[in-house]
Amino acid sequence: MRTEKEKMINGDLYEPVDEELMKDRLHARKLTRLFNQTIETDIEKRTNLLKELLGGAKDNVYIEPNFKCDYGYNIHVGENFFANFDCIMLDICPIRFGDNCMLAPGVHIYSATHPLHPDERNSGKEYGEPVTIGDNVWIGGGAIINPGVTIGDNVVVVGAGAVVTKNVQSNVVIGGNPARVIKQLVV
C-alpha cells in the first residue's frame, strides 16, 4: 500500500494531515525560517540551507528572502537560478526549473490543487499536478503559475502579473489573465 507521501508526489488524492507529511512541512518551515533570517552577506549559510531544503539544485542558485514553500524536496532547480523577494512555491508535486531561470519579486508557483466536487473537497483530501519550467525562462513580478503547467524553453518571458493556466510553447512572451501569447520571439 502506498504512503500518503507517495500519493501526494504522484498527484493522487492524499491526506495532508498525515503524520509524515506534517513533519515534513514543519521541517521545511524551520529551514525557510532559518533561511529568511540570514544576513545578506552570509551567502554560504544561505546556500547550505537551500541545498538541505530543495530536492535538487545545480550550481549558482540564489534566492532572496522571504521565500516560502510546502516541502522543498519537490523543488528542483537548474544552473543559474535566481528568485527575487517574496516567492512562494506550493510544491506538493514536483516543480522543476531548467537552466538560466529568473523569477521576479512575488512570483507564486502552485502545484497544489483541490477536488472540484464539494463533497470530495470537504473531505480534506487534496492532490497536485507537477509544474515544469524550461531553460532560459524569465517570470515577471507577481506572476502566478498554476498546477499542471509546462512552460517551454528558450527565452520564454512571462509578463508581470500574468496568470498562467495552460501550457506555454517555447520562444514567446506571454501576459494577462489568463495569460496568452503576446509576441513570438526569434531565437
Regions found by a protein language model. Give the residues of each.
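Flexible, glycine/small-residue-enriched loop-and-beta-strand segment within the central core
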Residues: 67-77, 82-151, 172, 177-178, ...
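Short, flexible micro-motifs
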Residues: 14, 143, 162-164, 178-179
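Short glycine-rich loop/turn motifs that provide flexible caps or phosphate-binding loops at active sites
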Residues: 10, 139, 158-160, 174-175
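C-terminal/domain-terminus segments
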Residues: 151-164
